[in-house]
UniProtKB/Swiss-Prot annotation:
Name the UniProt record assigns to this protein: Putative DNA repair protein recA homolog 4
Classification lineage: Eukaryota, Viridiplantae, Streptophyta, Embryophyta, Tracheophyta
Main subcellular location of this protein, as a coarse class: cytoplasm
Organism field: Arabidopsis thaliana
Localization of this protein: Cytoplasm
SUPFAM superfamilies: P-loop containing nucleoside triphosphate hydrolases (SSF52540)
């Protein structure tokens, strides 16, 4: 079989982020269904707010409420450890009954061995191995269920290397076809209220499966204020 016949460009169905400017900047109209997306950035940069705003678009289209999250249709879970959380995510994906899953956050996915150990014990790369195993399993299930899986992640400083790195090892960078770097760039005052202005940088927008593009033309880095 020729490669040109086996792999054909196609538009991937998406979920809107709730921001028209960001949807346009992403190049595909939103966050792709059946894929894994990472939203990361420093604290108080708007990562969780973006995820909640997108959920509000799915739960109530009219956006009658200020934030719009319909708590009657929103499942909230607070697992005891990282393995339990990722096992729950796997169950939800395979059920095919959930459109969007948000994991907030990667840094909070503490391995059980670390919870059971003593303070000061060395637990090198346990979380990275846990994430790597889970993402290998998720990648195929997401395509079958067309569920969107969003991981919210923090950045931290690392000595002797890049100024900022994300938690959870390198597996998330490899498996996520779209990574959104969120940064706060200022505040806007309207009357007595302050609103956060955020800049979003889309780092890569190619599907992991075969490294194919999410749309026909190649995706450039996109910036958008949300």
């Amino acid at each position: 079989m020729y490669l040109s016949r086996a792999v054909s460009p196609r538009n991937v169905p998406v979920f809107s982020t709730g921001s028209f400017a960001l949807d346009v900047a992403l190049g595909v109209g939103g966050l792709p269904k059946g894929r894994l997306v990472e939203i990361y950035g420093p604290e108080a940069s708007g990562k969780t707010a973006l995820a909640l705003h997108m959920l509000s678009m799915l739960l109530i289209r009219s956006l009658a409420k200020a934030i719009g999250v319909n708590t009657e249709n929103l499942l909230l879970s607070q697992p005891d450890c990282g393995k339990q959380a990722l096992s729950l995510v796997d169950t939800l994906i395979q059920s095919g009954s959930v459109d969007v899953i948000v994991v907030d956050s990667v840094a909070a996915l503490v391995p059980k061995g670390e919870l059971d150990g003593e303070m000061g014990d060395a637990h090198m790369a346990i979380q990275a191995r846990l994430m790597s195993q889970a993402l290998r399993k998720f990648s195929h299930s997401l395509l079958l269920s067309q569920t969107l899986l969003i991981f919210i992640n923090q950045v931290r400083e690392r000595f002797g290397g890049p100024t900022e790195v994300t938690s959870g090892g390198n597996a998330l960078k490899f498996y996520a076809p779209m990574r959104l770097d969120i940064k706060r760039i200022g505040l806007i005052k309207k009357g007595e209220e302050f609103f956060r202005m955020t800049k979003c940088l889309c780092l890569n927008a190619c599907a992991h499966n075969g490294k194919s593009s999410l749309r026909e033309d190649s995706e450039e880095q996109a910036r958008s204020a949300i």
